[in-house]
């Protein structure tokens, strides 16, 4: 600024800076600065500094007054909490005075300072305050106190798009609309120079009309001149983050606005499919899919997504160098996906949204989730011992959209101001607020009327469309009627033809019967006449042949007659149906004509009404002019009243200043007097105390110092007199001050009288204002009524015009259709006459084709018989195998029944033993002889127990033998199957090779014929006869070649069908075998459980067999009591069972968890759907304990989709793919190209990732996470070890080798959820003990010989499924 400017221009510039809301030194910013200083300095430790104390004593009271006058949280009443985040919450509030509804966002100052990110809210405030865009949520006010920042925004009652997607299946039409609105909203933010970086459905809100607005600009960043951003932290939500933003972590991140278009592609995919494109349960999985987006982006087959939508998604979800939108928003707008007939880019905001929220009131929160109360303690700033400046980062945050202080100065008005009461200003402000509220309500009514007008226009469009559809339907029906009539005529003609044929056939039949009868007569005559001659015999045979031929002809004729009768009946039925259809169509035509006549009548009536309304409209326009004149006069009166209000306000301020000055003087005098009185009283009390002390001392001393005492007493009396005189002077001063106070009271009464006079004036003004407001309301109501009537009349007139045009168009179209139909009818009659001759020719051809069809049927029958013979052979083999299988299963059942019977017998014996032991205890005191007898019985029972254990061992051996036999039978069955398949394959290959040789021979033969010299001779020299012969030979060869090709194709189809059938049988056998293996595993676990129970029972009986301590006087053998406890520990530790939850369909976010009953035996881990399946021994999945690799509790990074309460209850197991056995085997495609993003180190396969939630490095035990700026991290996808990336980059030897040594492509992991947290620990500790110390052999050597029989069977089964799926596709 130049110093040569005048003071007025400088002051004007300063004034502009103070007024400018975007200035760093505006009035709100200066007030924030003073407020922050007072907050930060007002602590006991800081007030010890004299300068700080003086500053606070000077400004604290005024700052407190300013705090009361400025906007604060108490000005609003909270309706409901509608959102909660990391820094605070969002409340639905209502302003107490204006009664307007807002959404108020609270941000905790402590949380933002604590997380060292206090700058992100500035972008959010500036974008919402200064955007001035219909696509951005508007900020009305921003204010603060010592704990929170407050942002008062417009309330969006439609909720967010997450709520909409959860309530509706979004069609492509809706997705197009919302994607277009998001594109325009992002373009508005980009045009302001910001990048959003967190575009997701949670930040897309819907207003009351259903249109979209963007919110939550906390991650926004200002672009440089080149439209780029430099950032070294990955910001955003994992599912929607782009690859270039993800790569920026720990490096030099440099990217532009194209990162927002990536998020738009993810959002569009989620709307159409229902899930994000790179969904994974763990954060590492999501990030690895995003980095490998070229291979991991797929579309589901069951969703009908258009090519344009897929093209747009692929154009968004690609590398940033070629991403759509990099060169501007116009190339996105030009995409074919956005082409439609319902809206244009310029009128998108004015069109009706697909979903308009149904709201019951202005505080309807039905589209927001109900949140629980936050019961956690709120953290605040601790009391500092030195200056910290916690409030300084928030200076200048305050913002008001309609700032009212610092008005334009007018010296004449300021000089004429006088004393006025504060109540006058408040009452006038209330009236202004009421008027503003009325204006707001009027605006709302206007919006509602506009919305109703839009909806009525939509309804009208729908009605017009329906009318068009009805007209089209009518035309279609008329065309259908004409078509049906044509078909009816054709059918009638066919019926007549068939009747004629039937009559002809009947005549032929009669002739044939007559001929047969004559032939019979001749035959009888010949038999009688010439029995001896050979000629007669020959004639007889000839006649018999003729008779047989005649009989055959008769049969065929009868069959054709039956067929013709059937066709005749069918034709008659179809004719009746067509007639009924014709009647229905005629009725509909009559109804349409009636509706047309009614519409004509309504049109004429509405035209008459319209003319009447036009007459009334002229009269209403005159009334509107008068009302407008009256409104302008009322507005001038309101301005005059406002002017009076300002004048009265200035007078009130002066009076208030005078009162404040007098009160200050009075208070100062009172303070001085009180201070002097207190000092005098203190001095007097001190003298009295000293006098008492001296008196006590003098009483104890000798009489010789009485004179000194008298002298001291005199001095004390003098001092007392002086003090009394001083007290009298102080009392006089008090009296004088009281006189002054009485004078001030008189002045106060006079000022009160003036105030009463002013209140009377105020009441008069209020009455005038009320009368004026009533008049204004009446006039506004009249105006609104007239406007609504005019709108309805205009709307009805437009409707009538539209109906008139539509009816005219329909009449014209009907006339044209009638002409066309008449023309078509004439042409059809001509065609009908020409078609009669063609029908006769076609009938002859049909008879010839029937003859050929009989020949083909005989050939088909022969082929079917051959196929049936082969199927019978295959069925016979399958039945033999099934019989073998049934015999084995019956043997196994017999063994199980034996074991159960033995167990029952053992139970009976145990019960008897228990009764006997009880009797022995009771009778022990009575008779020792009885005790010895009982001991004998116990010994017998022990012998029986030993015998039973031997039997059980024998049964176990038999069971093992049966298992071995089952395995051998399976192997034999497999070998037989393989041999059959190989034989069939060889046979097929032989057939194919023979067919190929024949084909090649035929081709070679043709080539030889074609390459003969005879063909190369000139055509003129060639003989015509030779050429004809060669042409005949060529035709024959061509026919033979075609026949051979047909045979070859038939053979290929036949063999392919047989191969498919065999593969299907193999699949069924494998599934059946899989189920048997699972049942066998469950039976083995049950047998193991029964053995453990038997051991427990035997141990308890052995313990019970020892005499009690009373009987033996405590003399037990050493070590006898220790043996049973060992067995009990073994039985309890080898088995664990209970309810666990597994991910439903592999997607926790969408489908949640599925409960299963899990049993862990010594060899297997069995999963049952319920306890009934457990009783029936039918598990849904079985895992081999030998194939387990790793068991561990999960962290938040492994299952970031799960709830925070569930994470301590979840654990993960890693196992070999071959160790799994399911009911429904799923063949998963192996993804290629995924290993390229891994970093190998000490057997680990590290994936680069980021942690925004608590996690620690397992190498250095330091934090590995941060909410906004997490450090670069690595996680092994084998053993899930987490580490800083620096350890690997600096080649530090801190990371231990990978504990899991298996191939990830042939291994699986599973998440399991235990209900209590303690249960999770039990399961993990138990399963860790079960893991084998050495890795499974199949994974160490990777040789096919070491694999188990079940794994090979599963692999062969998967190959078969792949082959069948490939061939069927």
Swiss-Prot record:
Cofactors required: Mg(2+)
N-acetylserine carried by residues: 2
PTM comment, free text: Autophosphorylated on serine and threonine residues.
Keywords: Acetylation, Apoptosis, ATP-binding, Cell membrane, Cell projection, Coiled coil, Cytoplasm, Cytoskeleton, Golgi apparatus, Kinase, Magnesium, Membrane, Metal-binding, Nucleotide-binding, Phosphoprotein, Serine/threonine-protein kinase, Transferase, Zinc, Zinc-finger
A GO biological-process term: mRNA destabilization
Membrane topology: Peripheral membrane protein
RhoBD domain: residues covered: 949-1015
SMART domains linked: C1, PH, S_TK_X, S_TKc
Site (Cleavage): 1113-1114
Protein kinase domain segment(s): 76-338
Metal-binding among keywords: yes
InterPro entries: AGC-kinase_C, C1-like_sf, HR1_rho-bd, Kinase-like_dom_sf, PE/DAG-bd, PH-like_dom_sf, PH_domain, Prot_kinase_dom
Gene3D superfamilies in the cross-refs: 1.20.5.340, 3.30.60.20, Phosphorylase Kinase, domain 1, Pleckstrin-homology domain (PH domain)/Phosphotyrosine-binding domain (PTB), Single helix bin, Transferase(Phosphotransferase) domain 1
Superkingdom classification of source: Eukaryota
PANTHER family: MYOTONIC DYSTROPHY S/T KINASE-RELATED (PTHR22988), RHO-ASSOCIATED PROTEIN KINASE 1 (PTHR22988:SF33)
Subunit architecture: Homodimer. Interacts with GEM, MYLC2B, RHOE, LIMK1, LIMK2, TSG101, CHORDC1, DAPK3, PFN1, PTEN and JIP3. Interacts with FHOD1 in a Src-dependent manner. Interacts with ITGB1BP1 (via N-terminus and PTB domain). Interacts with RHOA (activated by GTP), RHOB, RHOC and PPP1R12A. Interacts with SHROOM3.
Pathology noted in the entry: May play a role in hypertension. Rock1-inhibitors lower the blood pressure in spontaneous hypertensive, renal hypertensive and deoxycorticosterone acetate-induced hypertensive rats, but not in normal rats.
Protein name (database record): Rho-associated protein kinase 1
Gene name of the record: Rock1
């Amino acid at each position: 600024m130049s110093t040569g400017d005048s003071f007025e221009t400088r002051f004007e510039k300063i004034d502009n800076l103070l007024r400018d809301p975007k200035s760093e030194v505006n009035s709100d910013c200066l007030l924030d600065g003073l407020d922050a200083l007072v907050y930060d300095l007002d602590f006991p430790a800081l007030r010890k500094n004299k300068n700080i104390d003086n500053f606070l004593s000077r400004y604290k009271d005024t700052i407190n007054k300013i705090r009361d006058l400025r906007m604060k949280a108490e000005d609003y009443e909270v309706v409901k909490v509608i959102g909660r985040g990391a820094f605070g919450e969002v409340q639905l509030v209502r302003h107490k005075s204006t009664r307007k509804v807002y959404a108020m966002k609270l941000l905790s100052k402590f949380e933002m300072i604590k997380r060292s990110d206090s700058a992100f809210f500035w972008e959010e405030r500036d974008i919402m305050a200064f955007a001035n865009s219909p696509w951005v949520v508007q900020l009305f006010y921003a204010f603060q106190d010592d704990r929170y920042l407050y942002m008062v925004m417009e309330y969006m009652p439609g909720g967010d798009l997450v709520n909409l997607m959860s309530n509706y299946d979004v069609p492509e039409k809706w997705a197009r609309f919302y994607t277009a609105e998001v594109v325009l909203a992002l373009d508005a933010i980009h045009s302001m120079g910001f990048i959003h970086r967190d575009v997701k459905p949670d930040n897309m809100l819907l207003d009351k009309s259903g249109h979209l607005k963007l919110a939550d600009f906390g991650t926004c960043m200002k672009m440089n001149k080149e439209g780029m951003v430099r950032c070294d932290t990955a910001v955003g939500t994992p599912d929607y983050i782009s690859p270039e933003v993800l790569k920026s972590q720990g490096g030099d991140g440099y990217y532009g606005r194209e990162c927002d278009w990536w998020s738009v592609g993810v959002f569009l995919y989620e709307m159409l499919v229902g899930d994000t494109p790179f969904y994974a349960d763990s954060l590492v999985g999501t990030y690895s899919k995003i980095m490998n987006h070229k291979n991991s982006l797929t579309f589901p087959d069951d969703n009908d997504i258009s090519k344009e939508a897929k093209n747009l998604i692929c154009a968004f979800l690609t590398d940033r160098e070629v991403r759509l939108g990099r060169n501007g928003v116009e190339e996105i707008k030009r995409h074919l996906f956005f082409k439609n007939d319902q809206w244009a880019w310029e009128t998108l905001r004015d069109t009706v949204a697909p979903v308009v929220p149904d709201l019951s009131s202005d505080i309807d929160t039905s589209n927001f989730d109900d949140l629980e109360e936050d019961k956690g303690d709120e953290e605040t700033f601790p009391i500092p011992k030195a200056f910290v400046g916690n409030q300084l980062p928030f200076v200048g945050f305050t913002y008001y959209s309609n700032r009212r202080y610092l008005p334009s100065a007018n010296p004449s008005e300021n000089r004429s101001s006088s004393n006025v009461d504060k109540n006058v200003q408040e009452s006038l402000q209330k009236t202004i607020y009421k008027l503003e509220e009325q204006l707001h309500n009027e605006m709302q009514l206007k919006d509602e009327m506009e919305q109703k007008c839009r909806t009525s226009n939509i309804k009208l469009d729908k009605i017009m469309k329906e009318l068009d559809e009805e007209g089209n339907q009518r035309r279609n029906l008329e065309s259908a009627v004409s078509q049906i009539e044509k078909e009816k005529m054709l059918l009638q003609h066919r019926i007549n033809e068939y009747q004629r044929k039937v009559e002809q056939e009947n005549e032929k039949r009669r002739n044939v019967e007559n001929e047969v009868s004559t032939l019979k007569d001749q035959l009888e005559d010949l038999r009688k006449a010439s029995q001896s001659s050979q000629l007669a015999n020959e004639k007889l045979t000839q006649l018999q042949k003729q008779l047989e031929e005649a009989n055959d002809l008769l049969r065929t004729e009868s069959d054709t007659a039956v067929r013709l009768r059937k066709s005749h009946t069918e034709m008659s039925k179809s004719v009746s149906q067509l007639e009924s259809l014709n009647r229905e169509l005629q009725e509909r035509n009559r109804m349409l004509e009636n509706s047309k006549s009614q519409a004509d009548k309504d049109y004429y009536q509405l035209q008459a009404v319209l003319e009447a309304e036009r007459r009334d409209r002229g009269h209403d326009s005159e009334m509107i002019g008068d009302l407008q004149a009256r409104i302008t006069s009322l507005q001038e009166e309101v301005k005059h009243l406002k002017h009076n209000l300002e004048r009265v306000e200035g007078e009130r301020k002066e009076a208030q200043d005078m009162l404040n000055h007098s009160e200050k003087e009075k208070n100062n005098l009172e303070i001085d007097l009180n201070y002097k009185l207190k000092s005098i009283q203190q001095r007097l009390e001190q003298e009295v105390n000293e006098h008492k002390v001296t008196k006590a001392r003098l009483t104890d001393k000798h009489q010789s110092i009485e004179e000194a005492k008298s002298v001291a007493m005199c001095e004390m009396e003098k001092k007392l007199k002086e003090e009394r005189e001083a007290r009298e002077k102080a009392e006089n001063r008090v009296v004088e001050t009281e006189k002054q106070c009485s004078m001030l009271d008189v002045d106060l009464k006079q000022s009160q009288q003036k105030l009463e006079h002013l209140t009377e004036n105020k009441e008069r003004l209020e009455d005038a204002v009320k009368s004026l407001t009533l008049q204004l309301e009446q006039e506004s109501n009249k105006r609104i009524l007239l406007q609504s009537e005019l709108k309805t009349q205009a709307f009805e007139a437009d409707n009538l015009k539209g109906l008139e045009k539509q009816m005219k168009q329909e009449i014209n179209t009907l006339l044209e259709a009638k002409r066309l139909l008449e023309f078509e009818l004439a042409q059809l009659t001509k065609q009908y006459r020409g078609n009669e001759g063609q029908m006769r020719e076609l009938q002859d051809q049909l008879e010839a084709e029937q003859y050929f069809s009989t020949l083909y049927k005989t050939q088909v029958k022969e082929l079917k018989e051959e196929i049936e013979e082969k199927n019978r052979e295959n069925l016979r083999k399958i039945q033999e195998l099934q019989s073998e299988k049934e015999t084995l299963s019956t043997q196994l059942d017999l063994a199980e029944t034996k074991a159960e019977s033995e167990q029952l017998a053992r139970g009976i014996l145990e019960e008897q033993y228990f009764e006997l032991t009880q009797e022995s205890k009771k009778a022990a005191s009575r008779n020792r002889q009885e005790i010895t007898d009982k001991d004998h019985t116990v010994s017998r029972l022990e012998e029986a127990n030993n015998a039973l254990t031997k039997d059980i061992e024998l049964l176990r051996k038999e069971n093992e033998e049966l298992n071995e036999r089952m395995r051998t039978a399976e192997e034999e069955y497999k070998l037989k199957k393989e041999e059959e398949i190989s034989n069939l394959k060889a046979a097929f290959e032989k057939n194919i090779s023979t067919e190929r040789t024949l084909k090649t021979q035929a081709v070679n033969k043709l080539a030889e014929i074609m390459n003969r010299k005879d063909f190369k001779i000139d055509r003129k020299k060639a003989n015509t006869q030779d050429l004809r012969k060669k042409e005949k030979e060529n035709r024959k060869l061509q026919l033979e070649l075609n026949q051979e090709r047909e045979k070859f194709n038939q053979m290929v189809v036949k063999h392919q069908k047989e191969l498919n059938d065999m593969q299907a049988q193999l699949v069924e056998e494998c599934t059946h075998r899989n189920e048997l293996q699972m049942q066998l595993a469950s039976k083995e676990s049950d047998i193991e459980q029964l053995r453990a129970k038997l051991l427990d029972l035997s141990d308890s009986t052995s313990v019970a067999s020892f005499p009690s301590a009373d009987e033996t006087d405590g003399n037990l053998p050493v070590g006898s009591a220790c043996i049973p406890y060992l067995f009990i520990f073994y039985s309890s530790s080898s088995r664990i069972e209970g309810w666990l939850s597994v991910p439903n369909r592999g997607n926790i976010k969408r489908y949640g968890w599925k409960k299963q009953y899990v049993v862990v035996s010594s060899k297997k881990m069995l999963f049952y759907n319920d306890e009934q399946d457990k009783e029936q021994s039918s598990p849904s999945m079985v895992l081999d304990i030998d194939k387990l690799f790793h068991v561990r509790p999960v962290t938040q990074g492994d299952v970031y989709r799960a709830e925070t309460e569930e994470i301590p209850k979840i654990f993960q197991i890693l196992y070999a793919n071959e160790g799994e056995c399911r009911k429904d085997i799923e063949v998963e495609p192996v993804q290629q190209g995924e290993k390229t993003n891994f970093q190998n180190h000490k057997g680990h396969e590290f994936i680069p990732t980021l942690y925004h939630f608590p996690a620690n490095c397992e190498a250095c035990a330091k934090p590995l996470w941060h909410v906004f700026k997490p450090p670069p991290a690595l996680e092994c996808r084998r053993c899930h070890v987490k580490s800083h990336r620096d350890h690997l980059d600096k080649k530090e030897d801190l990371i231990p080798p990978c504990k899991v040594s298996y191939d990830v492509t042939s291994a699986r992991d599973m998440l399991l959820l235990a209900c209590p947290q303690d249960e999770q620990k039990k399961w993990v500790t138990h399963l860790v003990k079960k893991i084998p110390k050495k890795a499974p052999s199949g994974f160490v050597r990777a040789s096919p010989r070491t694999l188990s029989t079940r794994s090979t069977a599963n692999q062969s089964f998967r190959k078969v499924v792949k082959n069948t799926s490939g061939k069927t596709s």
